[in-house]
Swiss-Prot record:
Keywords for this protein: Oxidoreductase, Pyridoxal phosphate
HAMAP family in the record: GcvP (MF_00711)
Family stated for the protein in its record: Belongs to the GcvP family.
Function: The glycine cleavage system catalyzes the degradation of glycine. The P protein binds the alpha-amino group of glycine through its pyridoxal phosphate cofactor; CO(2) is released and the remaining methylamine moiety is then transferred to the lipoamide cofactor of the H protein.
SUPFAM superfamilies (alphabetical): PLP-dependent transferases (SSF53383)
Cofactor: pyridoxal 5'-phosphate
Name of the gene encoding the protein in the UniProt record: gcvP
One of the GO BP terms on file: glycine decarboxylation via glycine cleavage system
Name of the molecule in the record: Glycine dehydrogenase (decarboxylating)
Provenance organism: Rhodopseudomonas palustris (strain ATCC BAA-98 / CGA009)
Subunit structure and binding partners: The glycine cleavage system is composed of four proteins: P, T, L and H.
EC number(s) on file: 1.4.4.2
GO CC annotation: cytosol; glycine cleavage complex
Source superkingdom: Bacteria
Length: 990
């Protein structure tokens, strides 16, 4: 892809690094603070007015009243002065130039691909798509829900299975999720899982890491011979194998079924356009990566993984599932289905902590399939396979026979002591190969040309002509795909994959979908505990440059020098910001960060000869991923009570720490708390746990209230994960990607995650904290976003952002308190960066629910706050520092107007069932309907605020019927329109 560049006259050498490599420095100029001004919403005049409303004389006074004195960090962060946007881009260009973009034919789950420019511009680079939140509010998420529905349909069709989820984090973790599903669903009570030795090494490493704390044994071997007599609950088969081997797994799958074990197939999606899909082979579960459907390798990510299952396993499927339901008008509408089966809701009973996905990447994958259609995908697959066959024919002429006669796109060649010479010649051709002990692997892809194949032949010591080799090979080129495995079933026959083949039609389809959604490009998203702040355009630009996007994660380190300079500096900055001593960038979500952090604690206790330390104390207010992650790490959860103020009950914590002193592993605590308050006793909590031999895991979800003001590692925490997609500006992407790196104190550093690509042992041992993600540095390419954010903000800018985040939350609390009680405050009457309002008494008096308030906010043009977490029946509001006073006032005005509407119900003007609250959201169908029988005017329902008439967001559907959707589960196409009549019939039958 062609990178969008900045003016060529920028002085690239104007940016230098301090000796400590902490931050570029330059001569200060007034423009240095320009980005900080643009990132922060309120103007100086607004700040003064908001402080007055909040009852504070200055930001310093407000901060002093908000944070406990004992945790304040008084010294400026050692990050240096900020760069301007143009200087930052120049610096990123220099970093990118240090990366060498070779043609990487390493394979192993990562392949060159071509992202259609129409998708790059209108999805990947479009804030309407990348700034949206997870589609928990379906009425304002219909566009991306339809795109995810297409993704699920694509996965179901290609795998031949019944139900697919809306993506997972990467292939390695998808395999681990499949293993956990198999253990739960298998007919037998075995404690071992078989893994095909021809599975990608990073997948095996992730499986070993996941299995070890749970007491499961991983058996790696040849499934055709090693399964006999093995007592297993399931097996993973790579299809085609990591070495390229393509064999028929039907007999192995049948043998597994006889044992009462489940068959998991890790399948290549492009290959599945030509070979028999896993479902037709008898597989129970299929997993894999969708990366090669248009998403650059990005030095490891982000990429969408997939999982599909047979119908009987759908309620055990991890992650999110998009389903089709109906709205209040009986029209088709998408929603997230079967949400009560999501693992974070199951808390300590969970077998997974998955609560996210890779939505933006899955949307790209789906649009790639829409763009190419089934014929186009098959044509790409045939071209890749044919060029692989021509390559094999030429290698045979040169005396190198592929190890396997049947393959799709990957060859393994035994080369013996000629390996190093061949590798050197390949590198001279700017080609990377997969290097094994005595063999070389070559994986071709969509970007491979005849010239690439000829360069490979030169690396192997010959000079051959592609056209001549292809002509001479003749019919022999068609023998590498065995007849028994050739696909005969149709796929992607639905209109979505047929109707948008011209760029004009595809462009309009993507625009139509984005117009249905409400993202940050249209309005404030006040979700508590989500930190929906600005994702600045400059931060996003380097992401699509080839210098960052085109690197395979397993290239020689010297080819990724720019990336590694970025990693080193980012780790240093994050350590400085948090007060920790070491950082791992591998976890590719917040939940993965939790898991990795707990594994460091587990490893620490094991190293001290204390394997019995397994008790993890978790407050009752914790997010469900906390107990789920603890369960995955092999820990036993003990719940700690919260007091009437929402704080951890220190007496209960002390009693439980004493009761479990001999076995205490850790406490998991969120700070500021999930109740939106800085608890006064955080140091005491840390001291209590340490006194009983435990470690303190501090959940970094709310770090946006601490940066520059407090450092977890300085007030007693031992480890935290950091949500870069919250505090450090990686966009939420409609539900992913995210990044959850962890910071640790020095004594936990030896137990940070490792990776096979970095020398991890593959013999069943685990070094450090094992391997938690498929790639060594997780979703490396989006680290550029957080890096450039810190680069442009500097220490003072980051601190000011935190102060304004706290101000905005306290301003909202002050404005809304006369209308809705603010549930929790600290002893000085302050909230942190978010606040919880409590309408529960109104439900008692009028019947109004938080759902009614959330849906009515759509009519005012807003996404709802976080509903019923951490307290059922309440709303948690987080404005972030990026929202202006004008937008915050607009939101507060909407909430106050809704309170007046509730008062109308209280006064008896209309019952709640006939109120604009219960009928919300109001659609164009409502305002144009021939009949209007409601006891309030159309204008009151549809245009409740002054801006509604000039800048109206129309929900494309009425309120979605969740119960109907779960009772009539539909998770893949036929097209939406076909279900309108079915919905009518269903209602008539009721």
């Amino acid at each position: 892809m062609t990178p969008l560049r900045f003016p060529s006259n920028l002085p690239l050498r104007a940016v230098a690094f301090d000796e400590d490599q902490s931050m570029p420095h330059r001569r200060p100029i007034d423009a240095a603070n320009d980005f900080v001004r643009r990132h922060i919403g309120p103007s100086p005049q607004d700040i003064a007015a908001m402080l007055a409303t909040a009852g504070a004389g200055s930001l310093e006074q407000l901060v002093a009243e908000t944070l406990p004195y004992a945790i304040r960090h008084r010294e400026p962060l050692k990050l240096g002065a900020p760069l301007t946007e143009s200087e930052a881009l120049a610096h990123m260009s220099e970093l990118g130039a240090q990366n060498q973009v070779f043609t990487s034919l390493i394979g192993q789950g990562y392949y060159g691909t071509i992202l259609p420019t129409v998708i790059q511009r209108n999805i990947l680079e479009n804030p309407a798509w990348y700034t949206a939140y997870t589609p928990y509010q379906p009425e304002i998420s219909q566009g991306r829900l339809e795109a995810l529905f297409n993704f699920q349909t694509m996965i179901c069709d290609l795998t031949g299975l019944d139900v697919a989820n809306a993506s997972l984090l990467d292939e390695g973790t998808a395999a681990a999720e499949a293993m956990a599903l198999a253990e739960r669903a298998a007919a037998k009570n075995a404690k071992a899982f078989f893994v095909d030795a021809d599975t990608h090494p990073q997948t095996i490493a992730v499986l070993r890491t996941r299995a070890e704390p749970l007491g499961w044994r991983i058996i790696v071997g040849n499934p055709e011979t090693g399964l006999e007599g093995a007592d297993v609950f399931g097996a993973l088969l790579q299809y085609p194998g990591s070495s390229g081997r393509l064999s028929d797994p039907r007999a192995v799958i049948a043998a597994l079924r006889k044992k009462g074990a489940l068959a998991v197939v890790a399948a290549d999606l492009l290959a599945l356009t030509l070979i028999t899909p896993p479902g037709e082979l008898g597989a129970d579960i299929a997993i894999g990566s969708a990366q090669r459907f248009g998403v650059p390798m990005g030095y490891g990510g982000p990429h969408a993984a997939y999982m599909a299952v047979r119908d009987s396993l759908k309620r055990s499927l991890p992650g999110r599932i998009v389903g089709l339901s109906i709205d209040s008008h009986g029209q088709p509408a998408y929603r997230l289905a079967l949400q009560t089966r999501e693992q974070h809701i199951r808390r300590e009973k969970a077998t997974s902590n998955i609560c996210t996905a890779q939505v933006l990447l899955a949307v790209i994958n789906a649009m790639y399939a829409v763009y190419h259609g089934p014929d186009g995908l098959a044509a790409i697959a045939r071209r890749v396979h044919r060029r692989t066959a021509v390559l094999a024919a030429g290698l045979q002429q040169l005396g190198f026979a592929p190890t396997h006669g049947n393959y799709f796109d990957t060859l393994t060649i035994e080369v013996g002591d000629r390996r190093d010479a061949i590798v050197a010649r390949a590198e001279a051709e700017n080609i990377n190969l997969r290097i094994n002990a005595s063999s070389l692997g070559i994986s071709l892809d969509e970007t491979t040309t005849p010239a690439t194949v000829e360069a490979l032949w030169r690396a192997f010591g010959g000079s051959l002509d592609y056209a001549a080799v292809e002509r001479d090979a003749g019919d022999a080129l068609g023998t590498a795909l065995p007849a028994a495995l050739k696909r005969t079933s149709d796929y992607l026959t639905q209109p979505a994959f047929q109707d948008y083949r011209s760029e004009t039609e595809l462009l309009r389809y993507m625009r139509k979908l984005s117009d249905r959604d409400l993202a940050l490009d249209r309005a404030m998203i006040p979700l508590g505990s989500c930190t929906m702040k600005l994702n600045a355009t400059t931060e996003m630009m380097p992401l699509t440059w080839p210098e960052f996007g085109s690197l395979h994660p397993f290239v020689p380190k010297a080819q990724a020098a720019g990336y590694h300079a970025l990693f080193e500096r980012l780790e240093t900055w994050l350590a400085e910001i948090t007060g920790y001593d070491a950082v791992s960038l591998q976890p590719n979500s917040g939940a993965q960060g939790e898991y990795a952090g707990l594994l460091t604690i587990r490893g620490y206790h094991l190293s001290r000869g204390e394997p019995h330390r397994k008790v993890c104390l978790i407050p009752s207010s914790a997010h469900g991923t906390n107990p789920a992650s603890a369960a995955m790490a092999g820990m036993d959860v003990v719940v700690v009570a919260c007091d009437a103020h929402g704080d951890v009950d220190v007496d209960d914590l002390r009693a439980k720490a004493e009761a479990h002193s001999a076995d205490l592993a850790a406490v998991m605590i969120t700070y500021p708390s999930t109740h939106g308050v800085f608890e006064e006793h955080i140091r005491e909590i840390c001291d209590i746990v340490h006194a009983h031999g435990g470690q303190v895991y501090l959940d970094g979800a709310n770090l946006n209230a601490q940066v520059g003001l407090a450092r977890p590692g300085s007030y007693g925490a031992d480890v935290s994960h950091l949500n870069l997609h919250k505090t450090f500006c990686i966009p939420h992407g409609g539900g992913g990607p995210g990044m959850g790196p962890i910071g640790v104190k020095a004594h936990l550093a030896p137990f940070l995650p490792g990776h096979p690509a970095e020398g991890e042992p593959l013999n069943g041992g685990l070094h450090g904290g094992g391997t938690v993600s498929a790639a060594p540095w997780g979703s490396a390419s989006i680290l550029t976003i957080s890096y450039i954010y810190i680069l442009m903000m500097g220490a003072a800018g980051l601190k000011r952002a935190t102060e304004i985040a706290i101000l905005n939350a306290n301003y909202i609390a002050a404005k809304l308190h006369p209308h809705f009680p603010v549930l929790y405050r600290n002893p000085r009457g302050r909230v942190a960066h978010e606040c919880i309002i409590d309408p529960r008494a109104l439900k008692t008096s009028t019947g109004v629910t938080v759902d009614d308030i959330a849906k009515r906010l759509i009519d005012y043009g807003f996404h709802a706050p976080t509903m019923s977490f951490p307290v059922p029946g309440t709303l948690m509001i987080e404005p972030t520092e990026s929202e202006s006073k004008a937008e915050i006032d607009r939101f507060c005005d909407a909430m106050i107007a809704i309170r007046r509407e509730i008062a109308q119900v209280e006064a008896g003007r209309y019952p709640i069932e006939q109120s604009p609250l219960r009928h919300a959201p109001h659609t164009a169908h409502d305002v144009t309907s021939a009949e209007w029988t409601r006891p309030y005017p159309r204008t009151e329902g549809c245009f409740p605020a002054p801006n509604s008439r000039t800048d109206k967001y129309w929900s494309p559907v009425g309120r979605v019927d969740n119960v109907y959707g779960d009772r009539n589960l539909i998770c893949s196409c036929p097209p939406v329109e076909d279900y309108a009549l079915a919905a009518d019939y269903a209602r008539a039958a009721e």
